[in-house]
Amino acid sequence: MNRLIYIKNTYIYSKYKDMESIFQGENILEFIKTFPDDQSCREFIANEKWKNGYKCKRCDNTKYVYFEIHNKRECTKCRYKESATAGTLFHGVKFGIQKAFCIAFEMTCTTKSLSSTQAAKRYGITQKTSWFFMQKVRLAMKSSKKFPMKGNVQVDEFVVGGKETGKQGRSYDSKKSKVACAVELTDDGKIKRGYANVIDDYSAKSIKPLFDEHISKDANIKTDQWTAYKIIAKTYKITQEKSIPGKNFKEMHTIIHQIKTGIRTIQSHVKKGHLQKYLDEYFYRLNRSIYKDAIFDNIFKRLVSHPHRGWKQIVVIK
């Protein structure tokens, strides 16, 4: 029996290994045909997780017995059993792996994502359950910080949460969440990609990590005349100019408007402690907008390779 299961698993793996991606496109009906049930989804997870070979987490043994139920593998030496989802961001999903796949698909392939309330109604789960898994997907969307922006880059800051009475300009004591944002433009001035960091205040110390993490020292950076950028200009090529509404920084203001509108109309309210995840989600989609056909393949691999995170590691009480 185990021999037959091993042969079946080897066949599935060889078929998976020969594929350039597990799914291409944005058609939800075709997506469901590719992943028709929980078992097929677990098989794809197992083959991605162990694509470079199996190694027992306890004793490093490389031989195993395969169990089709939950796609488990049992070490032949210490008998440690490990499921396909163990140690991944799919770990602990009890509402159905296929539903989890569909939620991840919608978060990546739709233009504006969806709210946890919408996902809960659509897939017959609680809002709390959908929110928790969607936060896991957002963790997987975090930038690798390996590909700094080059060429023409615009940088600015904004607040999330609307205006406060008596607050004008950059108010350090504002209770609203503050964000520093950078956008790379194409040669003809169109938006290419971008990143954003939640910041504590508008000081150079708070803003500079955005430069260090996401902008090349060779980039031609344009900012407004805020004093913090004068300090950062000591190590980056920055040109400062006065911000004139409707005249300059149009691309940056377009991005800021989209982020604020998305949070207000789709998410309704986002706590400051979770805001970075929503920014990561927005720019994950934006930065791959010309590669939409392969975007699920990318997020799937990230969900499998990212270490498991539990409820206490994700929830922020603020």
Where are these regions (language model features)?
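Residue-level recognition of single "structural anchor" positions
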Residues: 2-318
